Amino acid sequence: MLFSKSLLLSVLASLSFAAPVEKREKTLTLDFDVKRISSKAKNVTVASSPGFRRNLRAASDAGVTISLENEYSFYLTTIEIGTPGQKLQVDVDTGSSDLWVPGQGTSSLYGTYDHTKSTSYKKDRSGFSISYGDGSSARGDWAQETVSIGGASITGLEFGDATSQDVGQGLLGIGLKGNEASAQSSNSFTYDNLPLKLKDQGLIDKAAYSLYLNSEDATSGSILFGGSDSSKYSGSLATLDLVNIDDEGDSTSGAVAFFVELEGIEAGSSSITKTTYPALLDSGTTLIYAPSSIASSIGREYGTYSYSYGGYVTSCDATGPDFKFSFNGKTITVPFSNLLFQNSEGDSECLVGVLSSGSNYYILGDAFLRSAYVYYDIDNSQVGIAQAKY
């Protein structure tokens, strides 16, 4: 039997409309600018304050005090806060969990916020306080506001309205609830921070996000809330369960930070360690921090100890093997050049960027994370990890 052309087209059209439509996940892309600053970081205590932005539960007197001028990176994204929106830039950090902004009466090169000019501001309570590993801090009030980020608007987002701060810019912490500054205060409480609010308000389907720092010389990177982007990594994502410890190495009833198990490190074909330790994946830390014996082993192999640095140094032109970090069968390769940090511009001597954590865990900062694509799955208390692709 012959079909007319019009009848055939009608049948095909009906079939196409009847075909199932694949549901696309709701995601939100947040771009950030990479800022590199060479500035004197005075009195940095190596063992007790790894990194430049690590949230501290309590200060420690242990460690070597050094004066280090170090080019470090931080990741600025633009937000609007309040009604009408006040635009400012904040530093994105996976190692802490709170949004806070420089408030009325403070100053910052990257913008400040004045709650008296907002009709959506709601003060919750006083007592906002957060401190970091470099000795900097911010204090003020807890409040709720409307915040626009990446083209999306979130209402009633809890944040710190800082009335005093010496950090330089506000911070957008996107870590776990248990690491919120409010959970560590005398009047302890927790709240739904940005990733959870994005899901609660239907802006993304999953409380999860992917971090892509881009290459060492790149000027921008991105976070994809709610999903992952397979074009930015090689192979598949290895799934890692989070380890239930806090940043002092103490066991907890649930995950409070993005600790995973690092099973070993190789340099070229040589094994550095096959002992498994927890490792914190922290974009707010610049270097890599390792258990003391491992950090010393790497330092001695590739540098000479310098008391003025408080660490091992080598020529900035030095070459070495790729470092391979093993996680549940997945290997992340980090070029040796990513581990060298110049003291100041023009110096011929570089710090080998693997220092002692003073604890039985690693902190894997930007020196590692630039080589990795990391999917932070808050809903399932897991992390996915793969080799980043540039």
From Swiss-Prot:
Q: Which GO terms describe its molecular function?
A: aspartic-type endopeptidase activity
InterPro entries in UniProt: Aspartic_peptidase_A1, Aspartic_peptidase_AS, PEPTIDASE_A1, Peptidase_aspartic_dom_sf, SAP-like
Q: Where is the Peptidase A1 domain?
A: 75-386
Question: Could you name the Gene Ontology cellular component terms for this entry?
Answer: cell periphery
Where in the sequence is the active site? D93, D282
Indicate the secretion signal residues: 1-18
Q: Give the matching Pfam families.
A: Asp
**Keywords, sorted A to Z:** Aspartyl protease, Hydrolase, Protease, Signal
The GO annotation for biological process reads:
proteolysis
Which Enzyme Commission number(s) are on file for it? 3.4.23.-
What's the family? Belongs to the peptidase A1 family.
Supply the name of the protein: Acid protease
What's the source species' lineage? Eukaryota, Fungi, Dikarya, Ascomycota, Saccharomycotina
